[in-house]
């Protein structure tokens, strides 16, 4: 049994359809795959999310948001999109991250024909590096 959604919750998720999500998630997954970043392993290169950040910024601007970029490290900008409301009600903040882990054991990515950043659908599942951490989630956030 599922909890009943409020009218506000229904409105927030009404923009998320399977087709829109699949298209956007696929685009986000293949865009600007970052290098690894692991503070416990200084031999790995630093992370880089600039390409995905600029894509997200463009998507938010297209939705009519004011977009700000904050960069505390080179090639790792944070994107903030602001959509001003018309009333004095509460603020809704949605947040996600854009980095993904590097591909480990590429020989095990048989569901994607050994192309981990190629989103591949099998039934109700979407396989790709970043599909659940967290480009798929990010697609939902943008569509909401």
Label for each model-derived stretch:
Residues 89-144:
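Active-site metal-coordination/substrate-binding segment of hydrolases
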Residues 2-105:
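N-terminal helical capping/dimerization or prosegment-like subdomains
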């Amino acid at each position: 049994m599922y909890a009943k959604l409020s009218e506000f919750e229904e409105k927030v998720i009404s923009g998320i359809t399977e087709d829109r999500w699949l298209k956007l998630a696929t685009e986000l997954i293949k865009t600007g795959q970052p290098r690894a970043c692991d503070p416990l392993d200084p031999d790995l290169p630093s992370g880089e999310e600039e390409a995905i950040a600029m894509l997200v910024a463009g998507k938010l601007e297209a939705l009519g948001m004011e977009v700000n970029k904050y960069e505390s490290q080179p090639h790792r900008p944070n994107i903030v999109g602001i959509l001003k409301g018309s009333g004095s009600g509460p603020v809704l903040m949605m947040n996600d991250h854009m980095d993904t882990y590097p591909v480990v054991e590429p020989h095990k990515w048989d569901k994607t024909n050994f192309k981990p950043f190629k989103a591949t659908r099998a039934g109700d599942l979407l396989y790709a590096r970043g599909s659940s951490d967290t480009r798929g989630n990010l697609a939902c956030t943008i569509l909401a």
